[in-house]
């Protein structure tokens, strides 16, 4: 089979690799169809890791993906795949925080190979059948939609709350759409790139601004009050500063963006005077059923896909994503037919 493996910073190599071996009980062999490139993938590609986690050996990236099940209970069906494998039995998992499991394995991060390969095996309970009306790309993007759902939950958004989204990359735009469906009052967006501001407007933002005057514009639009909730999806200190300045006293800021380094700074005096609450967003937590329901309800996932590349051009795809010249870059691994799929032939071993 063909796989794309990250060897070092900027060194993504596509090569033939052995097909998967025996499939354990409770797992399925999958033929990968579509893989979205996430901002966290770019941290591994451009920075060599995230926080204290670094590339220790060559790894196959990719955690936003859809596939066709070759074996197992969903054989012949297209599936979206939850990329996180928590242990399920530690105290954190028993409390329901599967996304915070200290020993979680996550596709394409650390030691577990991800989806930029033609075949892989995955636990059956993490597979979610796709309805015919959702494309393979949409199936892959259920993962970032799940992150957006989790981020909105962490923000404690209530019906009628005014919301600011800082950063209109794919996560930010999905946060915007989820906030709308959760009954938000007005939803504002601050984003530096013009084409992403345009995407935010098409996705239902009440107003969008560039960062230079973003906080001031939010305060003007709310008669000096500020917003009830901020979801920060940019990962920069400037974005956090905008979040603090635009928040109302007693407001809540959900930090979803991942910084390039391992530290973030914010205006402490202003945040203290406002009595702001900061909450960290860690991936998602059992959100696939809700993501599927929201996609069926009209959250537009295909809108975000602005560029596609075959797996043989995976390095080119990562370069395009790093340049941020569009919204979402997708790697096409194989065809799942976009609807009901026939069972692919198992790879020859």
Where are these regions (language model features)?
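NAD(P)H dinucleotide-binding glycine-rich loop of Rossmann-like/cofactor-binding domains
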Residues: 87-166
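Residues in the short beta-alpha loop(s) of Rossmann-like NAD(P)-binding domains
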Residues: 192-193, 259, 284
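Glycine-rich beta-strand-centered segment in the early N-terminal region that forms part
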Residues: 20-35, 50-91, 131-133
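Glycine-rich cofactor phosphate-binding loops and adjacent beta1-alpha1 units
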Residues: 155, 198, 203-277
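N-terminal glycine-rich cofactor-binding segment
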Residues: 5-22, 39-66, 80, 101-113
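C-terminal hydrophobic helical "lid"/dimerization subdomain
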Residues: 1-3, 241-244, 285-349
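Mid-domain Rossmann-like dinucleotide-binding core that forms the NAD(H)/NADP(H) cofactor-binding site
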Residues: 76, 134-213
């Amino acid at each position: 089979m063909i796989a794309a493996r990250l060897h070092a910073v900027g060194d993504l190599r596509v090569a033939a690799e052995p097909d998967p071996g025996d499939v354990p009980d409770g797992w399925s062999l999958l033929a990968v169809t579509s893989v979205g490139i996430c901002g966290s993938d770019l941290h591994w590609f451009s920075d060599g890791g995230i926080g204290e986690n670094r590339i220790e050996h060559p790894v196959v990236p990719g955690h936003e993906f859809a596939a066709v099940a070759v074996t197992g209970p969903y054989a012949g069906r297209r599936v979206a795949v939850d990329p996180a494998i928590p242990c399920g039995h530690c105290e954190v998992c028993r409390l329901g925080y599967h996304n915070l499991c200290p020993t979680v394995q996550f596709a394409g991060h650390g030691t577990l190979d991800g989806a930029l390969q033609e075949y892989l095996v995955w636990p059956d309970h993490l597979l979610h059948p796709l309805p015919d009306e959702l494309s393979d790309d949409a199936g892959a993007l259920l993962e970032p939609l799940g992150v957006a759902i989790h981020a909105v939950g962490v923000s404690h958004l209530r019906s009628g709350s005014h919301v600011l989204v800082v950063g209109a990359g794919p996560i930010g735009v999905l946060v915007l759409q989820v906030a709308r469906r959760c009954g938000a009052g007005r939803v504002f967006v601050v984003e530096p790139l013009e084409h992403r501001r345009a995407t935010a407007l098409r996705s239902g933002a009440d107003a969008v601004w560039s960062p230079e005057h973003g906080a001031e514009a939010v305060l003007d639009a709310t008669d000096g009050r500020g917003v009830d909730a901020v979801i920060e999806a940019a990962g920069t200190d400037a974005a956090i500063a905008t979040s603090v300045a635009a928040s109302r006293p007693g407001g809540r800021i959900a930090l979803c963006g991942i910084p390039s380094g391992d530290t973030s700074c914010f205006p402490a005096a202003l945040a203290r005077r406002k009595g702001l609450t900061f909450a960290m967003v860690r991936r998602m937590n059992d959100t696939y059923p809700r993501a599927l329901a929201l996609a069926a309800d009209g959250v537009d996932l295909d809108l975000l896909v602005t560029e596609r590349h075959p797996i043989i051009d995976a390095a080119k795809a990562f370069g395009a994503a790093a340049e941020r010249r569009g919204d979402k870059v997708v790697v096409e691994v194989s065809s799942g037919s976009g609807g009901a799929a026939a069972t692919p032939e198992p790879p020859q071993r």
